[in-house]
Amino acid sequence: MLECFKKELELRKDYLDQKSVSTIYFGGGTPSVYKPEQIQMLIDECSKYWNIDTDAEITLEANPDDLNKKYLAQLRNSSVNRLSVGIQSFHDEDLILMNRRHTGKEAYDTIKRAQDYGFDNISVDQIYGVPGLSMEKWIENLDLVYDLDIQHISSYHLMYDPNTVFSKKLEKGQLIEVEEEESFNQFKYLIDSARENGFTHYEISNFCKDGYISKHNSSYWKQKQYLGIGPSAHSYNLKQREWNIAHNYKYMKAVQEGGEFSEKEDLNFFDRFNDLILTSLRTYWGLDLGLVKEQFGDDLYRHCEKKAAKYIQSKHIRKENNALILSDEGVFISNDIMSDFFFIEED
């Protein structure tokens, strides 16, 4: 697989209309199954085709059980300078339900160990809306996160995706989905407590200490180009969306034999506008109305002004420096607001 990654990098070296990169992210599964020297080899491979900024953010997603002492010691000798650790919960019963291999104690100890090895830019994932996760347990989870003195939190509601263990258990009546009000209260507590502990809520699901906004995720939300390598990886060049074959063997075979290993979707004028809505309104920078007018003209500028009026009146949106920004109340209904702002072409 590594040779295929190298081959795809070579094949797609001209995809990005830029000569340097500010962020590299090893994610999309469990990249920590690769040895640190293999991770570094891929970073070096990237440097053949692009200049990597001296202050580039280079992130490795990892499960707690992969980050043992030997792995961390070797990883410190690589260019990786940020860890994103999939903790999910510190309660063992939740971790068993989510089919995780680590325990709550192992997760906590892993973060402490990574800090001991000098990693000072660490993000952790937390899941709320989990069946059986009471508010008391959720508060305990977050208290442990704050106690760890990490720099970044990503937190998501449990999703019942089709054909997953969760969705099958739900269908069989083996799980009871959390009430919407309980999920709302857990999310609200997260927002309030994160602020009290020095975090900025800079995107719907993301919180950071000063100076630790994720460069990588921010690239998506700020409509920057990105290139994804490997099975299921997505790419975007401001004109097209592109996604690779999901099946490992089919991907490897196509890359090795010079076949097609991705699909493309051309974005029309309104697709690009709706993308801007989706990525901008979810952030604390908000939707820049000046940018809307510059890139999409007066009609869509007026469309945004008109849509915003009722949400400004209801205090779900505030207008600052010609940008539309969701309030805390707006964040709770963000999907509805963004859908309302979308421009749908009439047949």
Kindly give the residue locations of the regions a language model identified.
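Short amphipathic alpha-helical interaction segments
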Residues: 298-312
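Short, ordered coil/turn segments that flank beta-strands lining enzyme active or ligand-binding pockets
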Residues: 222, 313, 328
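C-terminal scaffold of the Radical SAM
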Residues: 1-14, 19-298, 346
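A short, conserved structural fragment
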Residues: 312-322
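Minor-groove-contacting beta-hairpin "wing" of winged helix-turn-helix DNA-binding domains
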Residues: 323-327
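Short, amphipathic alpha-helical interaction segments positioned at domain boundaries
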Residues: 329-347
